[in-house]
Regions:
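Core alpha/beta nucleotide-donor-binding catalytic domains of modification enzymes
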Residues: 1-191
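An accessory alpha-helical subdomain
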Residues: 91, 193-208
């Protein structure tokens, strides 16, 4: 069970106090937020509206707000400045700055992000393609500084099952299917080709 995995993770790091949860409203972060809400009542869901997709971005933020309100979870949002460069790297940097700011605002040193098993496989592969040393092969760290990632051993399939079983309604980001973004290209094109050689390629990448 995902809840058991998250509880073990929290106990492993002896995490107490206010939990900040990076909440895009997608499958992964909605799953994580829902699980955490069953474990702790001291949670703040924080959402950064990139505002790159106009009305779609607005509706995603609205869905996040409504989910948090319905679950009685404290909610905070900001909208990304228009002058931020519209690239994956710039967006990632802006998100992490936002999360650090939220940690200070709510007097917390614990920020949860919902990176999962599949994300880690894709990250390792991306680093191999770009060229990396042994440190890069470690993939996404489950803990670094104030950031904690309790879903790294949970697959995307398990998360989708949790969402379905609990009748949750996550945001479906249309840009996730846009293969001009390198990570989407890896997810939708390269990984499936590698699975023809090794159906367990995600396990292989996670084991590096």
């Amino acid at each position: 069970l995902i809840k058991d995995c998250v509880e073990k993770f929290i106990n492993k790091y002896n995490l107490t106090g206010t939990f900040i949860v990076a909440f895009s409203g997608g499958y992964d972060s909605m799953c994580l937020l829902d699980v955490l809400s069953k474990i702790s009542d001291d949670i703040v869901a924080v959402h950064l509206n990139h505002n790159w997709r106009g009305e779609e971005s607005r509706l995603e933020e609205q869905n996040c707000r409504e989910f948090a309100n319905h679950a009685n979870i404290k909610y905070y949002t900001e909208t990304l400045s228009d002058d931020i460069e519209k690239t994956e790297t710039a967006a990632r940097e802006a998100r992490y700055e936002f999360l650090k700011k939220c940690a200070k605002k709510f007097h917390s040193n614990i920020v949860f992000t919902a990176h999962n098993y599949d994300d880690n496989a894709e990250t390792v592969l991306y680093r191999i393609i770009k060229g990396t040393g042994t440190i890069g092969l470690q993939g996404i760290l489950e803990h670094r500084d104030i950031f904690y990632r309790p879903l790294l051993k949970t697959s995307r399939t398990e998360i989708e099952k949790y969402i379905k079983d609990n009748n949750l309604s996550p945001n479906i980001d249309s840009s996730n299917s846009n293969q001009k973004y390198k990570r989407n290209f890896i997810r939708h094109k390269i990984i499936p080709l590698l699975q023809e050689i090794n159906p367990n390629v995600k396990d292989a990448l996670n084991s590096l």
